[in-house]
């Protein structure tokens, strides 16, 4: 399910590639960082568009990092959409998903894609890896309470734990 938090990204033409993060607690500028997921998504989007421009990307987020609320996927989706928008291009959902997944793979290793799909579609999403995600429309929207414990977690660690458990006890995962 999507939450009412967001990331705003603005892209502009620049003499050098820059990525500037500004959120609740950090203000950071990164120059030419090849392993940064934003840089990776930026490059893949430019490649898809057939462009080779240098860009400045400014990021503002009110999604708490490391809280399990999908901040990395929102970041990757917003980056691809922002870069494409700079060239007056609106990406279809599939292309946006594919471009954002490059960054998610850098961050999480082997993500399912549910966070990217939810960031793109919003609301409640039915997702199964390898199949098209579907938006679930309910007659009445449930109210959810999300509590942040203050403990940061790495999604990639949780993915690895889940994968190991599924490999050790595959019978537990059959429906």
Please annotate each region the language model reported.
Residues 8-47, 51, 87-89, 98-108, ...:
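C-terminal nucleotide
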Residues 30-32, 68-71:
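Short, solvent-exposed loop/turn segments at secondary-structure boundaries
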Residues 2-4, 12-14, 62:
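A short, compositionally biased micro-patch
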Residues 3-5, 69-93:
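DPxDG-like acidic metal-binding loop motif
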Residues 67-68, 154:
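Secondary-structure boundary/capping motif
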Residues 55, 60-67:
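Short pre-catalytic strand/loop immediately N-terminal to key active-site residues, enriched for Gly-Thr
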Residues 2, 34-38, 76:
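Generic structural signal for well-ordered secondary structure
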């Amino acid at each position: 399910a999507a939450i009412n938090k967001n990331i705003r990204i603005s892209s502009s033409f620049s003499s050098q590639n820059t990525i500037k993060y500004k959120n609740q607690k950090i203000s950071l500028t990164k120059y030419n960082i090849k392993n940064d997921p934003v840089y990776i998504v930026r490059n893949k989007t430019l490649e898809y568009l057939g462009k080779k421009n240098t860009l400045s990307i400014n990021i503002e987020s009110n999604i708490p990092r490391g809280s399990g609320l999908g901040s990395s996927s929102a970041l990757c989706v917003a980056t691809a959409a922002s870069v494409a928008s700079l060239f007056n291009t609106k990406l279809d959902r599939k292309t946006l998903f594919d471009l954002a997944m490059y960054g998610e793979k850098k961050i999480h290793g082997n993500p399912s894609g549910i966070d990217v799909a939810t960031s793109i579609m919003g609301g409640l999403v039915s997702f199964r890896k390898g199949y098209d995600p579907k938006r679930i429309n309910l007659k009445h929207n449930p109210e959810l309470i999300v509590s942040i414990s203050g403990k940061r977690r790495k999604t990639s660690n949780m993915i690895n734990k889940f994968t190991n458990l599924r490999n050790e006890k595959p019978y537990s995962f059959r429906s």
